[in-house]
A protein has these predicted regions:
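Conserved PLP-enzyme active-site core in the AAT-like
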Residues: 1-162
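Conserved PLP-binding catalytic core of the aspartate aminotransferase-like
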Residues: 160-173
Length: 173
């Protein structure tokens, strides 16, 4: 969390929108909980809320930490640094061209309304359930332990180049 907070501060100092690649957001929250001082007693949801509070926008494939069979997200903070940086304003400060509206028009003409993004109701409900499940500490702990078990097994079997400790979604060799 410290690196996210400090990176956001630097980006904002130079008026650069701070964007997160949030494909593994829940996994990152788990490692923050386990490794950073002051987070041990916080829930994954509380950590996620803080983590996303520092960004001006994020992208994520929701097939990963969303447990969905499809879907992704591109999100921007309303009237945040991204909006200020890429919208055009008149001399009096009123809005001339709103980048949010431009993106919404592109979204609707390409993928469907921004409230569903061409996803079926079933897929949206599966995604909602998956996002909820990813906030379960026991699930995340089991996932990390499975990766460590596999990585340590490879290492003990003499596989060269196993990266230890393993992450939370795969084993690197």
């Amino acid at each position: 969390m410290k690196s996210i907070r400090e990176t956001a501060k630097i980006a904002h100092k130079y008026e650069i929108p701070f964007m997160l690649d949030a494909a593994r957001w829940a996994e990152n929250c788990y490692f923050i909980k386990m490794n950073e001082e002051g987070y041990r007693d916080k829930s994954i949801a509380e950590i996620a809320k803080e983590m996303f509070s520092y960004c001006d926008g994020f992208t994520a494939s929701l097939k990963k930490d969303g447990h969905a069979n499809m879907g992704g997200i591109l999100a921007f903070r309303d009237k945040g640094y991204f909006w200020k940086k890429f919208s055009d304003f008149n001399e009096d400060g009123s809005i001339k061209t709103d980048v949010g509206i431009l993106l919404k028009v592109k979204q609707i003409s390409s993928y469907g309304n921004d409230s569903y993004g061409s996803m079926s109701g079933r897929d949206i409900m599966a995604l909602a359930a998956g996002l909820y499940e990813c906030c379960n500490f026991n699930y995340l702990q089991e996932r990390v332990e499975q990766c460590n078990y596999l990585a340590e097994g490879f290492y003990k079997a003499g596989v060269k180049g196993v990266v230890l400790p393993a992450g939370g979604h795969g084993v690197y060799i």
